[in-house]
C-alpha cells in the first residue's frame, strides 16, 4: 500500500493569495527538490501515512455538523514529489475541494481544484516538464531583487509556454475567457525576520503594483494575526 511522508496536518485559515481567509486543512508533505535561502517552512521531519490515514486525520480536525467542508491545501516542501491524481480523487470522494501550493518544477495533478505556483529563480536539478494542471495563480515571494529579471527566469522553466510570451502572460490580470487561461498574479513580500528590511520590501511591492496594476498584493495574514 502506498504511503506518504507527511510533515504535519493542521486546521487553520489560508493566509496567502486568492483564498486568503478561507477555512483550510493543510496537509504538509515532507521533502523538496529546491533549497531556497528565504524558506520559512520546516519540512524535513515526517511520519509515514497512508491516504486513508491522511483522510481520517483531515476529517477529525473539523466539526461534522457544519454544512460546508473546509478547503484542503496540499503543500510542502514540494507536494508534487508525492501527490498524484488518485490521492486527490480520494479527497474529492470525501467531498473536499483540493488546492495545492507548488514551486512549479514538476507536473501537478490535473484534477486539482486550485493550483498556486510560486516559482523560484534558482537553478533546477531536473529537466523541463509541463505542468499537468495550469496554475490558477502565480505567487512570487519578493525579496527585493529585480522582479522583471526574476519573471524572465521563470519563463525559461518551460512550464508556462501555453500562456504565450512573457509579455503576454504578465499583462493579464484574471482569466479572460474559457478559451485562454491566465493565472492571477500575486506579489508577496518576503519575511526576512528584519523589520526594517521587511518594511522596505513591502514598500517596493506597493510601488511595483501601482505601476503594474495586473499584479495584486499577497500578505502572510496568518503571521499578522498570530495563527498557524
Regions found by a protein language model. Give the residues of each.
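Generic detector of intrinsically disordered, low-complexity, polar/charged segments
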Residues: 12-14, 18, 28, 73-74, ...
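Conserved Radical SAM active-site core
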Residues: 4-8, 23-24, 30-112
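A broad, structure-centric signal for solvent-exposed, well-ordered loop/edge residues
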Residues: 13-16, 36, 46, 61, ...
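Glycine-centered flexibility motif
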Residues: 17, 21, 77, 132-135
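Conserved AdoMet/S-adenosylmethionine-binding subsite of the radical SAM
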Residues: 69, 80-228
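Flexible, acidic/Gly-rich N-terminal and inter-domain linker regions that tether
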Residues: 1-26, 30, 34-38, 211, ...
Amino acid at each position: 500500500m502506498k504511503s506518504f511522508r507527511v510533515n504535519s496536518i493542521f486546521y487553520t485559515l489560508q493566509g496567502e493569495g486568492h483564498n486568503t481567509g478561507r477555512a483550510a486543512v493543510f496537509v504538509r508533505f515532507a521533502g523538496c527538490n529546491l533549497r531556497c535561502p528565504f524558506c520559512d517552512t520546516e519540512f524535513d521531519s515526517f511520519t509515514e501515512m497512508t491516504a486513508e490515514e491522511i483522510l481520517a486525520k483531515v476529517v477529525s480536525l473539523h466539526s461534522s455538523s457544519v454544512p460546508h467542508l473546509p478547503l484542503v491545501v496540499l503543500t510542502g516542501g514540494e507536494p508534487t514529489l508525492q501527490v498524484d491524481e488518485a490521492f486527490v480523487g480520494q479527497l474529492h470522494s470525501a467531498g473536499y475541494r483540493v488546492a495545492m501550493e507548488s514551486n512549479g518544477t514538476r507536473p501537478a495533478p490535473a484534477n486539482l481544484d486550485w493550483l498556486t505556483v510560486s516559482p523560484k529563480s534558482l537553478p533546477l536539478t531536473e529537466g523541463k516538464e509541463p505542468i499537468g494542471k495550469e496554475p490558477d495563480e502565480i505567487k512570487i515571494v519578493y525579496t527585493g531583487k529585480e522582479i522583471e529579471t526574476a519573471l524572465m527566469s521563470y519563463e525559461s522553466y518551460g512550464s508556462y509556454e501555453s500562456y504565450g510570451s512573457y509579455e503576454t502572460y504578465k499583462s493579464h490580470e484574471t482569466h479572460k475567457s474559457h478559451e485562454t487561461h491566465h493565472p492571477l498574479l500575486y506579489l508577496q513580500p518576503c519575511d526576512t525576520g528584519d523589520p526594517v528590511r521587511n518594511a522596505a520590501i513591502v514598500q517596493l511591492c506597493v510601488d511595483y503594483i501601482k505601476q503594474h496594476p495586473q499584479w495584486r498584493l499577497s500578505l502572510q495574514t496568518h503571521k499578522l494575526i498570530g495563527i498557524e
